[in-house]
């Protein structure tokens, strides 16, 4: 929105500078984007009258004139403008004048003829007007008056950026209202009376879409002179707001648009057949617009039409068939309230954006239409003459917006602002904003104004109070609070500690989308149901993940496609499992997942780089589990999973309950995904391992430890982990360490069996153990493994 500072000051004129005014506007939430002078820097230019105008004797394109500038004699001035003529009021730069660009006017001769000044065009004075030739001033312009004073050129054009909710400030009236509120000044609105009808002509209105157009006004004005010039003051105000003067009818409707924020339109009455219809377009209808383009109308487009077809796109663009031109004698003025949702997006649908659509789709004051009609009628009769008919209105009260009533609690206001504003001041602010307000029991009940569509909730009222009270008036007080140390159990394991351990093991943390490709997810987890998004970002991201593995495998593939063969990634996050018994029908589980592929170690001169295997990943996971309280109770139990290699996969169990899985990606799946080499993954429930071992001091034994090595022959199906657990259980407190150091199958061991070599370390804190005591521990271990696994000592 661009507006003239002087125009606003006609409505409200606070005793502040331009800079201070812009600061106020910005702090009101109407951000000032720029300020520029409406004219260049010049002096010595006055209003003159061309008394004589003759052809230059030696130049076809020059004229010799005598100009009256109010002095004791006429000035001889040579002019090359084609529109220079006798009787014209002009802008005359006299001797000594300085024009933009430090161009000084001196007496000179042009092709032998004396010239004592210059007749100026708009561009020569730094005024942005598209016009050929010199400036043509009104015939009543007082001769000798300084042009800057006559045209009020000591003015600034201020441009502001408005958020979509502040459509009420897309007008001089709205901006002045805000400035008046913050400066505690009354706004001086232009005074005009309702124009009485002098002719009986009426316009019939057929309001077929009241939900889209709850209020529609038309008025006939006959015998207008559309060739009458728009007054200079109107042209200048339009120009300073960025609108070019076209003809008096268009200029007047644009003027009302800028002054009140009410878009209006004018039809040529001779081209309209009554009744005028307000309806939605029919499929296949077309409309030739005022710019000559043809719009193929869609059924969601609101139209102004008659029995012959569309006349205009309601609230967006007029049609050429009913447009006003130089031959127009009678006009029909339109002023309406179109529902924002009926206009929103329609202009963009046709590649258009107009001042009218910009306002209607944000919301125009629904009480403004009649006032704007009266103002436009007054101006039109003053400028173009004519006779006005009665204002014809069709409206639907049930579809008109209702002003909102919102309550504001004193406690909420104080809490959000962090500052106490006197009750009377708050009430006064609401009154100055034009709201109706009552206060009782520490609650303000506020009814907003018809021009404020954005007042809907309590926070909106708090924003209004803060804006008008002044953000800079709210002190910068640090918040006061009673601090309490956050409880932290010593047994809680910080997730950051786990992440650090994995980073130390040469892993990198990944963050993948919670939305995954349902095809890939069903490939990995065919028996798990996934949540499908109703409005996904894309087809490839239309399901919620039931595991983090699909995202990590995607990251592996992404890296491999970029020549990164060694990949070690981990991720923590939620997986989403449909569960009718869970809140909202979905169980959200926080898990830790990891993936490795490529070589176990980076390339190095000291050794050959070997590919990763199952036990590399298992070892890394065991290192993580060693930090947890239940790590020594975790078991890896062979189990098959859909996504994993049947011979290289295991369930992760804690106290017999499955909390995760580990293994190699199934070769067929790896091939379908395009993965290179073997890829190993694990996923484990974080909550199951989120406790850590609380450090307990233990006395270090001063007595020697004794080691005994046993080679136990067991069936192939016996897990080594279960055998070791049985040894620890049978050995009691004196058995301080059990370690598996060899697995053998071959000569000397029957087929279907394996030899597990384990070391048993026996020690006591109180004394040196005798052989009998050591042998007792060993015998207890042998008896236990014999009973549970039918283990035999290897010969």
From Swiss-Prot:
Subunit structure: Tetramer of two alpha and two beta subunits.
PANTHER family tied to this protein: PHENYLALANINE--TRNA LIGASE BETA SUBUNIT, PHENYLALANYL-TRNA SYNTHETASE BETA CHAIN AND LEUCINE-RICH REPEAT-CONTAINING PROTEIN 47
GO biological process, one term: phenylalanyl-tRNA aminoacylation
Binding site for Mg(2+): 454, 460, 463-464
FDX-ACB domain: residues covered: 701-794
Alphabetical list of NCBIfam families matching this protein: pheT_bact (TIGR00472), YtpR (NF045760)
Domain spans labelled tRNA-binding: 39-148
Swiss-Prot/TrEMBL catalytic activity: tRNA(Phe) + L-phenylalanine + ATP = L-phenylalanyl-tRNA(Phe) + AMP + diphosphate + H(+)
Family: Belongs to the phenylalanyl-tRNA synthetase beta subunit family. Type 1 subfamily.
The EC number(s) this enzyme carries: 6.1.1.20
A GO term, aspect molecular function: ATP binding
Cross-referenced Pfam families: B3_4 (PF03483), B5 (PF03484), FDX-ACB (PF03147), tRNA_bind (PF01588), tRNA_synthFbeta (PF17759)
One GO cellular component, as annotated: phenylalanine-tRNA ligase complex
Keywords: Aminoacyl-tRNA synthetase, ATP-binding, Cytoplasm, Ligase, Magnesium, Metal-binding, Nucleotide-binding, Protein biosynthesis, RNA-binding, tRNA-binding
Name of protein: Phenylalanine--tRNA ligase beta subunit
Obligatory cofactor(s): Mg(2+)
Organism encoding this protein: Haemophilus influenzae (strain 86-028NP)
Compartments it resides in: Cytoplasm
Cofactor binding mode and count: Binds 2 magnesium ions per tetramer.
SUPFAM superfamilies in alphabetical order: Anticodon-binding domain of PheRS (SSF54991), Class II aaRS and biotin synthetases (SSF55681), Nucleic acid-binding proteins (SSF50249), PheT/TilS domain (SSF56037), Putative DNA-binding domain (SSF46955)
Top-rank taxon, per record: Bacteria
InterPro entries noted in UniProt: aa-tRNA-synth_II/BPL/LPL, B3/B4_tRNA-bd, DNA-bd_dom_put_sf, Fdx_antiC-bd, Fdx_antiC-bd_sf, NA-bd_OB-fold, Phe-tRNA-ligase_IIc_bsu, Phe-tRNA-ligase_IIc_bsu_bact
Residues annotated as domain B5: 401-476
